[in-house]
């Protein structure tokens, strides 16, 4: 296995593969992660649940410069020294109390910190090799694999042979072009300007917040990168040349007056709403920003990349380990494309009401911006219904309610989370492979039938007891529901691993022996 690119998507893919014992090499051109450009800052509750599975959620929280307890708020104001307009509490899934809806709260943390934590993690995984300073240059496919030309440190060139390649090399990487895919979509005509600055002596009287949206003559966003005086700012509508020449004036206006500060870095950028016309060519898969670009408003971009990596990661592991059909991989694009389309649409909707577009009126701001800061419906409520490996009567996904999350046991949905009486998460009881979740104490012959079938097919299956009045759920390694039935024997394992196409007859295998797994 070869992972091209060691940013968030590539590191997440390596973590997923390494968790499952699949050997892989990760090529990453950057020897070190730069902390001058923080990029994404929102790690969603869903991504934190994946980090929990990998065993690094606590490590990320320990490394995060802003503890969740410090603030869970987004504040709108005239300036950081001026009038408060309104607040959004528990933004981005930030909470210090347990919530039955998810196993992990969100975390505000700069992307470079996430990358550092994941780099350290995958370097400890047996069979995962992170080659820093190495970049892919060419990909040539044949029936048996992919030959990848690599440029190593010092310019040395060599080839790697891989059965599958995950292209996680972003917008400017080579993978998308090498397979002949292209972005389809548009770019926002407005420029944007980012600034990182140091102002150790400044503190706002508005109280702690993970973001301050300034609605004034100079409008934009400001936030802390740490609690030691490092700040970031985003000023929409500012050209690069003007921003570079007037950065100090812009900072002064946002803060509400002259404040001693030091400019650390600046970064002009443009928002893109782009999705590749295909996510796969035979043995090469596009993952993360190589497959899609979306505006940062709502904090979904980085998290969507992680979701891609998890989806293809467990599937390739299943194929490599011999318990799933290669046809399982055909489900990657249909499952993830729908999620990506919904996410890009939500981010674009958020972009229609940036700081300069909003009136300084609390109720109006609440109405316009609630879907941006309270988006659990999108983060947790997306479904893989209609997938070729999900036993669902639906042939499509209904649009999600971005704000409101309604737990569902419909096939394709994420398994509804709950905290168990002993204090553990239901998710901690799931296995690395598939899990049968249901009323095992009244198991009947169906549970043994399914367990025996899984054993015959070498499909890893864990048994998880649940409420007596619930149906049986076949839960995938990514915590999404593959099938639901009143009798466990009616759950279609063959469909879930790509061995049978939807609509064909499933043949049950009966057995008189009981499983004690």
Give names to the regions the model predicted.
Residues 122-136:
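A conserved beta-strand/loop element that lines the FAD pocket in flavoprotein oxidoreductases
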